[in-house]
Structures are given as C-alpha cells and as structure tokens.
A protein has these predicted regions:
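Hydrophobic alpha-helical topogenic segments used for membrane insertion/localization
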Residues: 2-26
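Conserved beta-alpha junction segments in alpha/beta enzyme cores
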Residues: 23-182, 186-356, 369, 375-551
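Anionic-ligand-binding alpha/beta catalytic cores of soluble enzymes and soluble regulatory domains
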Residues: 361
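Glycan-recognition surfaces in beta-rich domains, encompassing non-catalytic CBMs
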Residues: 365
Length: 551
C-alpha cells in the first residue's frame, strides 16, 4: 500500500478519534448542571455585553440628573391611614367606560405584543380597546381614589402621568389622592408600548434623534395620534367616573379559578383564586364588579393583525350585557396562560373559543354564591411610592435610549453640580409601587410589571432548585400586607417581568425567557423591600378615632 495513503488513513483515523474524544468531553461537561449553567451564563454575559456596547453608542442626552428630575403627576395616596370607619362613613363608587380607538385612524398602527419581522401592521379592528374607570371613597373626608384599566399591552409611567396631568384641576377640586391605571396586557391590541413597530427603521432614525435630547423626534410602534386620543379619553372617563359616584355597599370574594389557568414556568405556581370586588348601589342602579385575575391574554397568537381586547374584553362584554358595570384587572400573570380545555366545547373557531372562555369566566363570577362574599367596612387606605431601579438590563436600557419606550430614566451621580457631565453616573428607571387596603380585609398590591406569582403568594424555589442555588429570602406580598390579597399588575407603569432574584437566570436557559424583558436581576427584591417599607410606614401613620389629626 502507498505509504502516503497509509499515513493519510492513520491521520484521518486519529482525527476521527480526536473529534469523538472532544465530543465526549463536551458531552460529559454539559451533563453537569453546574457546567451547563456556567456556559449559559457566559452566553448571557456576552449577549448583554454586546447589547451594552450598542446602548453605550446611543446618546442619553435627554435623561435628567436626579436633582433635575420632575415628578409632576405622581400621587402618593393618603397622608395617613385610619383603622375604623369615620363618623359619616359610607362607600361611594362611580364607574365610566369609553373606547380609546379614534373615530378616524390615520397613519400606521402596529399590533403590540409580539416581536415580528416584518412587524404586525394592523389591518382591521375586531373589537375596540376600552378604558374603564372606577372612583371610590369611604366618605371620611380624606379624598377619592381612582382605579382604571386600559385594554392594551402595557402603558408607561410617563404616559400615565400625562393622563393624571390632564385632570389636574379635578384632582385639586375633588381631592383625588391616587389615580392608578393598569393594562389588561392583551397581545392583540394597538401598540401602546412602542416596541412592536419597525425596529430596524426606528433604530437608524432614533439613534440620530437621541443626540438632540428632548428636541429629538423619535419614532416607535406607537401612533402619536392614537396615544393622544387614548390619554384624553382616559382623562374624560376618569372625570365621568368621579361624577357618577353614588353611595352603596362593597363586598369581595376570592373565587376558585385554578382550572381556568396554567403556569408555564417552574415552580408552576398560580394564583388559584380570582378576586371579585362588587359594589351594590343604594339606589338600585347597576352593580360594579372589578375582577382581578392572572392569565395572559395571548389567545389570538403571533400573526394576528386585527386589533382585539382578547378574552378580558369578552368577559366585560358579557357582564355589561347582564347589566353589570365591569373591569378586568390583570394579576400576577408572568408566565401564566389560559386553560380553555375544561370549559370550552370542541369545534369552535379561534374567536369563538376565546369569546366562550371570557364569557364562561363572567358567568362563573356573576353566578357565584352571593353569601360567599364578605362585606367590607367603609375604610380605604392607599399608599404609593416612587422607586428608583438600576437599569441593569441592557436590552431595556437600549430601548429607552432609542426612545422606543418612554419609561422615565434619570442619571444618578456623586457630582455636586447636576448639570456636570460626569461619566460616573448610572441610569435608574423611575417607577411606582403601592397598595390599597379596603375594609382592613383586602389589599390590592399595585405592581408596575408582570409579577411572578410566587412573589405575591409564596412558593418560590428553594436553594437546591433555583438557578443560582440560593433561597428567596423575602416574604410574600400577602405576608407583608397581612390580609387577603389581589394583585393589580402592570399598574402605573410597564417595566417587564419581575422574577425572584434567586431564579433570575440566563436568557438562553430553558424557561427563562422572562429575564430578557425585565428591568434587572434585583428588581424583585427591590420591589418587595419597597412594600416592606411602605407597610412599616403605613403602620406608623395609622390612627384611630381617639387620636386627633392636624392637617
């Protein structure tokens, strides 16, 4: 045999053995959970580093230093809490609703909820997105609170403060202490967030505009005319709700809902009750029912092009038809999906199935045994706090710098002069957290994003099962607040997913998608710590009838 051929054969054989040995070594390394996590972390760090370099190339000229930050539009709730009903205490509630879709649509509209190339341009309206508002007071003379919800993917704190500022006169005149606006988080509505438009076009344009600071004119998935109409309509609806306030009684029930929902992320915790907050007016008028439920409205899927409210819209429509004014308020729904199988008959079209699911929940709530509802004494206490979160997630930072989203960011530095260009500053996201306590028995935790359920009710991974091998050492929001709890998610802001620190993993790890669209790995602990501080402060400023309050 030719010596060269023999040498080549030996070399090829050795190469094959070498490749196999290398593959076996890699396979053996990947079989170790610790090594697999290390590789995932390396990938995560590399990806975030790349995005960070891109973010660093975009000007942040438009973001103020902390001492120049203007928080006009922020409302902190009650100045003090009361334990017992006031002398003339009585529940007063008002309701109003309106479509936020303009009568004439001009320009491009994108469906908000799915990242698509090309983007999902709206080509029709299946049903109109709504704003629904409920004004509430305990007639203690301390003021009015408003809870409103918009059928949309999410709405930023900046846009919410714009709505509040449109009713500045009403806030002063009627002593409105808090205006809390949330999103149903439907993934089939017109984009109100900004991330779901023509991203390549926006990146190229907005990078130039960012250099102009506040004078820049960025583009995003949001239609400016639509957003203007939405804000004005929301403001008018809140005014109408306050105008419609009437006396009555308030009840609540925790209604089992576990087989209507399912969690897609371990440890598979769901809030297995929905909360029904039911107002019965003295004059025999329409009841108001606010339904707090955690489930993603993503039923129409990735390529749906017709704007729709998804199942929350059908739920409210069914209640409206029955003569009940209704609100659907999204809960701790991070990775929680609908479970339509047990309740929806076979053979329905997609839209028929979604409609049937929403109507089934509405019928279930309206038919629930009224004797199971607890009557709430007329006492409402609300506290809201601003929270500054370090913008750790470079994806969020890039989106904010490019003005694809308009969440408020500020620069925090040690420089004495707020105008000084000090490269040591860091960017912080400004958001809001808060809670309302009704009748000393039900707390509504107002959270600015998509909350992992175990943060609300417990059940987080222990150290041996979590991504980082550590315990989640924070109490649940229910433990902190010490009452029955309902969560108002995506409330007063839209900052993405809120994941327990101990399980905040690589964006490349299986079942860890949520980390890609989260403010950062310490977001959950910072938010829970804020709730602890708010509860401690509320306890300090709680008074009873025997104490004298000097305003």
């Amino acid at each position: 045999m030719n010596k060269k051929l023999i040498a080549a054969a030996i070399t090829a054989a050795a190469g094959t053995v070498g490749v196999k040995l290398t593959a076996d070594i890699v396979k053996e390394q990947l079989s170790s959970p610790d090594n697999k996590r290390k590789l995932l972390d390396i990938g995560h760090k590399a990806a975030m580093g790349l995005v960070g370099k891109i973010a660093d190339s975009v000007s942040d000229k438009g973001f103020p230093y902390i001492n120049r930050y203007d928080n006009t539009g922020f409302l902190e709730g009650n100045g003090y809490f009361i334990k017992e009903p006031a002398k003339e205490a009585k529940w007063y509630v008002g309701f109003a609703k309106a479509s936020v879709v303009p009568p004439v649509l001009e320009g491009d509209y994108y469906i908000g909820g799915y990242l698509a190339f090309p983007p999902n341009k709206m080509n029709g309206i299946m049903n109109e997105q709504m704003v629904r508002a409920m004004a509430i007071s305990d007639n203690s003379g301390r003021g009015i609170h408003v809870f409103a919800v918009i059928d949309c993917i999410g709405i930023s704190g900046t846009d919410i403060r714009d709505i509040r500022n449109l009713i500045g006169d009403l806030i002063s005149e009627k002593n409105i202490l808090s205006v809390n606006i949330s999103a149903t988080h439907c993934h089939s509505g017109i984009d109100t967030d900004g991330l779901w438009g023509d991203l390549p076009k926006a990146f190229k344009h907005n990078k130039k505009e960012a250099k102009k600071g506040k004078k820049g004119e960025p583009i995003s998935g949001k239609n400016k005319g639509f957003m203007t109409y939405l804000k004005k309509t929301s403001a008018k609806t809140i005014r109408k709700a306050v105008e419609n306030m009437t006396p009555g009684e308030l009840f609540f029930a925790q209604i089992p809902i576990g087989d209507y929902v399912r969690d897609k992320r371990p440890p598979y915790v769901t809030v297995n009750d929905l909360t029904s907050l039911r107002f019965v007016p003295e004059n025999g008028g329409k009841e108001v029912n606010a339904v707090f439920m955690a489930a993603h409205p993503v039923c129409y899927g990735y390529r749906h092009r017709e704007a729709s409210r998804d199942f929350p819209g059908y739920l409210c429509d069914r209640m409206d038809e029955a003569g009940v004014d209704s609100l659907f308020i999204q809960g701790a729904e991070a990775a929680v999906a609908t479970n339509r199988g047990p309740h929806i008959p076979d053979g329905l079209t997609t839209d028929e199935g979604i409609k049937a699911y929403g109507e089934a929940i509405a019928d279930y709530v309206m038919g629930y045994d009224k004797s199971e509802y607890k009557k709430l004494s007329p006492v409402i206490n609300v506290t809201v706090s601003e929270l500054f979160l370090r913008a750790d997630n470079k994806i969020l930072e890039l989106g904010a710098k490019l003005r694809l989203v308009n969440n408020p960011l500020v620069k925090i530095t040690m420089a004495d002069d707020g105008d000084k260009e000090d490269k040591s500053y860091e960017l912080f996201l400004v958001t809001e957290v808060g809670f309302a306590v009704l009748g000393n028995e039900l707390s509504i935790a107002m959270v600015p994003g998509e909350l992992i359920p175990e943060i609300a009710i417990g059940g987080a991974f222990p150290d041996w099962a979590s991504y980082h091998g550590k315990n989640w050492d924070k109490p649940s929001l229910k433990e902190i607040l010490g009452t029955e709890i309902a969560v108002a998610g995506l409330c007063n802001d839209f900052i993405g997913y809120i994941v327990p620190d101990n399980d905040y993993g690589s964006i490349f790890a299986p079942l860890h998608y949520e980390e890609a669209v989260s403010a950062g790995e310490k977001t959950a602990s910072n938010i829970v710590s804020a709730f602890i501080r708010m509860k401690e402060n509320a306890d300090k400023i709680t008074v009873n009838k025997s104490q004298i309050i000097s305003e």
